[in-house]
Every structure is written in structure tokens, then in C-alpha cells.
């Protein structure tokens, strides 16, 4: 069995190598699931929040939405340089940095809300990540996370044969 650090290295390499695939296929209107389901839910849950952290921000589309809703400070973190670079280039007044969910680079009680869209299903150490979220949330803060789940099916849902991974992997895609 591969070591934890070996697994993380392989996983980060996969995300780095395929960042453009994610950006092209799932952001800025390319993915109906984000446009029709996730962004409206995120807007509803995060409206009125002042200081928001977007864990696994990718290109920053949820972060930019939260900023447009009037948040004072929006920070986004992603474990891959390629996503951080694109999020920074797309602007929107965000503070974007490279970090993982298992070691959030923020002081305790820094945020009113933390959001993670389609992220936690990819995190190996969920317990540590949730502990970190709790640490950076202010008392009474809100943690909004969105997960892919086969029970939440929409037209177009089905099994995907992901040929990017070696060996290829099969998973359930919503929408």
C-alpha cells in the first residue's frame, strides 16, 4: 500500500496536470450542475456573510459569486498552483493561496462562513479538514459543503469512465 505522502503527491500531480480540463469543463457556464444547482444554493446559504473562506476554490467561481453578493473579504485556497493561478487571473477581489484543507493558513475564528463545493469527496483526511474548518469559523459561523452523491440525481447523471487516472477509475457524475 502506498504511503500517505506518496498518495498525496500522486493526487496533487493529477490535479495539477488536469487543472485545465477542470477549468474548461466545469467553470464559467460549462457545467449545468454548477450553474443550475450549486451556485444558486451557495448564493442562498452565503448571502449576507462578511468574511468567507472557499476551500478547494479551483478557478474561484464560487468565491467570485460570494464577493458579488457583498462579502467584505473572500479567501480561496486550493492545493494546486494551476488552479490558484487561474483564480488569481480571473480576479474579483479575492485573496487566493495554495493550501490544503488539512492545514488552513488562517488564524482561529477568522471567518463567518466556510464553503467547499465538490471538494470533501476528494479529501483523504476528512476529520482533520473538518477540524480545521471548525477552528477558522467564528462562533455561530456557517459551514456549507456540497457533495456529489448518487441519490441526488438529475437528468444526465450516470457512471463516468475517467481515463485520466492510471488505472482508469469509474465514478458517478451528477448532471
PLM regions and their residue ranges:
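Conserved class I S-adenosyl-L-methionine
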Residues: 2-47, 61-65, 83-86, 142-175
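A short, aliphatic-rich alpha-helical micro-motif
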Residues: 46-47, 108, 130
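Nucleotide donor/acceptor-binding cores
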Residues: 49-51
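Class I SAM-dependent methyltransferase SAM/SAH-binding core
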Residues: 53-55, 59-103
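A short acidic, Gly/Pro-enriched loop at the edge of an enzyme's catalytic core
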Residues: 102-113
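A short SAM/SAH-binding and catalytic strip from SAM-dependent methyltransferases
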Residues: 113-126
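A short glycine-rich, Lys/Arg-flanked "PGG" loop and its adjoining helix->strand segment in the class I
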Residues: 127-142
